[in-house]
Amino acid sequence: MNDILDKIIDSDVLVFASPVYYYSITGTLKNFIDRTYAKYNKIKNKDFYFIASSADPSNESIDSALETVKGFLRCVDNVNLKGIVYGTNLNDAGEAKYSDSLKQAYELEKNV
């Protein structure tokens, strides 16, 4: 984990991505965020992007998951949320390629 944390500290951009289950990010991503605690005070001056997908047709579950991510961002110095890409109403594998979220991700990528 120290190697990964050192790469995060040295990076200019962070991108977190997660499917949304039960109005939250996955346990794997949450565990990863929690494991950054050992060096969280060295994670600073970054642009941050969040990518999420949800079966929920509304934005409610995405908004709830985003609150967890924003909690992490409030604890690190000068990490700026630059973009969010999310897809809703995605129930089956491959559906995202037909949604607007893929276009959003492509446009956002141009600015990274």
Question: What are these regions, as identified by a protein language model?
Answer:
Residues 70-112:
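Glycine-rich phosphate/pyrophosphate-binding loop and the adjoining helix
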Residues 1-76:
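Helix-loop-strand module that forms the ligand-binding subsite of alpha/beta enzymes
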